[in-house]
């Protein structure tokens, strides 16, 4: 679960980290009032969406008057911001952040993730702030410095100082950086985060460090013990189909193709999308119904898939281990009858009672094509989608 920039900065302030004074605003009037509370300009106004690249898309602007603030708010509030990280529809802008402008002398990067390779929280720091860290890692990896957090000792101040020295910081900047490092590490561990990022972490012309931007990602598996973080969830930033799927504990990710995919198991779902691509098709989604592929969940999965108007055929790929394929077939038949599916449905069943399940599908009299293998299923669904 991602947070907005203003929410991240509110947390930073609570943990004693330096961030510009600012207010999240939902109306042009609130934006003007926020500028008055902050004091004399210039100010920076920022669209609040869960996506990077806002500046290049016009969603961040330095302004010198309240008239400019109102104009920016009227331009973006209620609209959608399209960046290189969004799809063609963009993300809805329901709030803008108004904050004091900062005199920037240098931009740095500081962030942390859970590294699966080391099974540790790893901090990364770089002198290349203000740009995508993925680009830095690809083009100049030597400019990224790391600190691995030992789970037994937790973050240590010396690690922050080491990173500061590697970044070329001097004097009071070193102690400020170490304090920010320790604060971020505390937030990361106490709030069950999967990602924390300040990009850029800036050095001002007075040699002070300021958290100019903030990005936080909370581990969704830990939300049950993070009620405050859960309250910060903004459903407007999610694909409505993904939100609906989450309510049924379905793992759904919308894609740009025209072949809907329903699979039990994340690995099998990835393999299914690969083989659809191999045979010339384009998956419309990733959808893992999990081990409990009941009729109700299969029905809901069909509804979610078919809510995408680009879908012209559906591939159902089920491997029956503990789950019996004949019961899955009953669920698919019932779901197709209830939902009223009007596109071809190709089903591949393998495993426990697969033959009986395939026979039930063939005898159903519905527009369901029983495939003999995964390759056969991919070929048939691609052909059906092209014919549609």
From Swiss-Prot:
It comes from the Bacteria. Belongs to the succinate/malate CoA ligase beta subunit family. Binds 1 Mg(2+) ion per subunit. Its cofactor is Mg(2+). GO terms for cellular component: cytosol; succinate-CoA ligase complex. Mg(2+) binds at residues 199, 213. Residues 9-244 form the ATP-grasp domain. Heterotetramer of two alpha and two beta subunits. This is Succinate--CoA ligase [ADP-forming] subunit beta. Succinyl-CoA synthetase functions in the citric acid cycle (TCA), coupling the hydrolysis of succinyl-CoA to the synthesis of either ATP or GTP and thus represents the only step of substrate-level phosphorylation in the TCA. The beta subunit provides nucleotide specificity of the enzyme and binds the substrate succinate, while the binding sites for coenzyme A and phosphate are found in the alpha subunit. GO terms for molecular function: ATP binding; magnesium ion binding; succinate-CoA ligase (ADP-forming) activity; succinate-CoA ligase (GDP-forming) activity. It holds the Pfam family Ligase_CoA. The keyword Coiled coil does not apply. Keywords: ATP-binding, Ligase, Magnesium, Metal-binding, Nucleotide-binding, Tricarboxylic acid cycle. GO terms for biological process: succinyl-CoA metabolic process; tricarboxylic acid cycle. Its EC number is 6.2.1.5. Pathway: Carbohydrate metabolism; tricarboxylic acid cycle; succinate from succinyl-CoA (ligase route): step 1/1. It catalyses: succinate + ATP + CoA = succinyl-CoA + ADP + phosphate; GTP + succinate + CoA = succinyl-CoA + GDP + phosphate. It comes from Proteus mirabilis (strain HI4320).
